[in-house]
């Protein structure tokens, strides 16, 4: 599969950003490619994306398990790497303010629930510690990806909701944070957690802050 992007694109910065936050068992980031596990609609596997600077394309390889949900993978990857961005429009808007850093993109996420978990785990700790904590949660609650040795699926809401708060606390987080993770997972199961951007962003952010363990800095 091939996706397109408009130059300039600072892939070194993007891979650096993702690499600093890479979760062991989920993501592998090198100078040349980004690879991770993904589960969707009962399917699971891994994918790898490799940018081609000369042709302004992103080459995507899916493991067999993800082929049935290829279209969903493409849409999520476009969002993760902000491929719909028009850098010229941004440059025209920012002018001199952005002239020194052309090609920056806004890193997205493959999954709103996963990003919610990672946001809660990232509270009041360094980027490196947030990645370590997430890796520990994945090791505790994630299941191996079939036919992809070394990779785990990000814990499902059901798996995280069923986790023992004290077992999560033992990974290196306050028990309140563990309870926040479980509450988030349960709200996804209940259908009360917004998995898509709300029509009113400000109202949506205020609503999220009413949830346990989520504040304005989350």
Language model feature labels by segment:
Residues 1-218:
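HhH-family (HhH-GPD) DNA N-glycosylase catalytic core used in base-excision repair
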